[in-house]
């Protein structure tokens, strides 16, 4: 009765795990509503569209224009700071800003921000991993590039081919440079620079984009303080000077706006992706001789600021409406930017050439008004339940404590009020009042919408958390009953779970999670050593229990078994260096094998001949891979077929064997299944990881000789799964997902198959350990198997809940998108696939189903 | 995480001998007082030299190693009964008769035999093979004196140090036999330092590497860290137990009954294990470099284990035995 009930609670707990993941994810990765279609000019209030001040734009983009590179005294940008006798910035020909780039500070999301004006979400980063996924292109989104093209302009692009990926077919002329070779500091940039003189002579383009990669490469390779940096800055500066000279001299470039902007900065180590000040503070410069008329005066070079906020700080998304406005384009629909107020002054002077208006005020106001209406549309799209009709003006605006959306509402009502109040005649006082009201609304709306992108549905987060908490409480008592009976092992497991759970709240421990598993597993080795070395002369060897299953190898290594295990762990630990802090240090796959190719191949052949009864098949595998490349796909499929046939055979043979007679036959079917699976996993692993399976085999042999108790077997299996995952090079960074084996035997892209193969190739070692430990536990009865699943479920549910709790409490943490969210994604994979599919479903005796 | 000279493997007796009882601190005031001071002294030394340790771990570890050895020797000679110092044992005189060959050889016999026969096996038949192998090892050691240049100085230093400890004797004498105490203490001390250098240091270094210390780099750091841990763990163990096979078997299986000596040894190793915890943090502090946290953990673990072993946990053994199997557990419900 009790047994049956605990069985059901475990089942329910395992159903609750995916449910909690679904609920939590829906709150954690909110879907951002994007407006579709393209913006057009509306003619409503005031009836006038501010005319474009420029008709061409020249965008010089370089990774890592961290603002202190451009603006500080130590910068190599001499020309930008100094022009002729005067200074480019001082003369007012360049308007300098610091453009805040929100995380993730990697190129593709940043380009999205610059072109669409929207704030990229974390989902964009995930989508960008699937390169084949075409939904991440910006072809069908409203960008100023699309607006320019719709107006009939031609676009030209040289540099980083991310642009070409984002805008396929958009450019009239283009020469993409891949940023694959990070150690290339010169060629990537020369490939851009060589086109510039020609393009400057052409007058057919209306947007000319240059994206330099050199600074980025130097940053990644040598850091921001490397000697290469200053020379590269001088090189960039000379490009700026060349372009500016052309702007002054060439007639067709008279109305060209030159924008110099960085897509992201870099941290002290030269890397980017996170949200440290260095990474989020790229420079932004608007350059044109026309700006000199504004008579803006800025000091340059300036003092160095520790927070890198030079001049006026704007949002990176502000580039979009500003460019659109200056070029006389409609503002892209999804833009969350605010027209940079300093540049409104362009219409003060530009108005002189346009006789239509008596004063410059209307243009400025119209510009902001258009911006406001566009942003209002975006706000309405995201908050459909709020009304922005003037007649419904609520009284809440007078209260002090307003939530963000209400603040936006009130700001908008204020705008409407001032507009109505001033009527049609704009005197300077009224217009400045309108302007400030508009800007207030714009800023509030921008703040609201930018946070909406990373806004969490807290209720769902808590519901998800409590569901997983409920799953824990379901499993806790059955598991506790088991663990209390195995007090030392239970305490060890409890210690492991507790320390892991607290660890999830520290970003560096999440990054270096492998260290925890190596550390705790060595503790486990000591535990096993103390227990079984003690048994040896504690004369309790009679504890043999039932014959140890089907495991073929069973030498007795009681004395030094644990020591050998420790050695094997040490080898595995160094197999692949992973994580962040020590990732660059030498390891076996990265440093040893490249210089010892023969050793690798010797180990490989050893690994291949390790499963003797299947030698024929395993021999086939390399042959199939090595014969003619034409039919590689076919061969791979054949091997896959052979392997799956063997697996099915082993299952059926098992059934037949059960029904007929026991014993006889050296290789029981379950062993054959395991060996076949091993073969398949070998195929799905990186070549350099294959010899590690030999180490695993040594380990399982030692473990088999130890006669572990039920709980110990479970803990061992658990630890091995995690240890080997990291030993194979896995980590909690999305960049460590290995897709090199995800396409074996597949001709076309299929999300499901590629996904499954990706999982298998990344989780090959854990899968092997699940299967191997299942073999180790093959003598277990039903209760013991249930105990196994109970403990596994408790462990998984606790881990899941601690990760969720960490993501919830640290949702405003600097590293939420770079460390904790990837960890959460990995935990989903661990829970949904490795736990439920591989561990729990693998535990079900499929032969029972076949019998029916 | 036990320090394990290979003697147990040599001395695999068929019988499971009864182990040596937990060790008491010598029951006189000086011993008891110093036993309280000693761990604090070690921690104070560590705290005092911490900045120097962070600045240059290798130089600091190397220069402090003799001091540490000296302190440990002073501690064991002040506070602990040497191997073979049996109060209720008169066979020690018969052991002296075995002194026949060289000077050193004979003294080693003096150290070992009484420990084997008298104190350790009061009521059980002695394990001849263990005794034999122990003697063999010591003979070997004496025949092939330690080749290392820096560390052999410790035995001599300890000899030089003996006049200091001699002062303690009058008080000791109230509780113990007067004659030969100095010699009886000096020789186990020499033995313990020799074995610590030759056996425990390499074993602990290997253990450090197995637990994740860098294998290809940081060799001096690892070796010195191992040496410090060896001095912390093994000096007292060897001084008290000599090369008693059954004791070392227990050490190998980590199931000695807790006392100050074993508690400190186990505490050192557990502390070193926990000392690895702060290393992966991204604080980028200089003290997060490899051997420092491990060593600090070891020192703290030493003191904690020392204290716990003497008091709360005295006489208890680390035991890993499950109470029942799953099926039984279910039945119990």
From Swiss-Prot, chain A:
Its EC number is 2.-.-.-. Coiled coil: none annotated. Glycans are attached at residues 191, 420, 576. CDD domains: GPI_EPT_2. It is found in: Endoplasmic reticulum membrane. It is a multi-pass membrane protein. The chain crosses the membrane at residues 458-478, 486-506, 516-536, 632-652, 676-696, 714-734, 750-770, 787-807, 824-844. Its main location: endoplasmic reticulum. GO terms for molecular function: CP2 mannose-ethanolamine phosphotransferase activity. GO terms for cellular component: endoplasmic reticulum membrane. Keywords: Endoplasmic reticulum, Glycoprotein, GPI-anchor biosynthesis, Membrane, Transferase, Transmembrane, Transmembrane helix. Belongs to the PIGG/PIGN/PIGO family. PIGG subfamily. This is GPI ethanolamine phosphate transferase 2. It comes from Aspergillus oryzae (strain ATCC 42149 / RIB 40). The gene is las21.
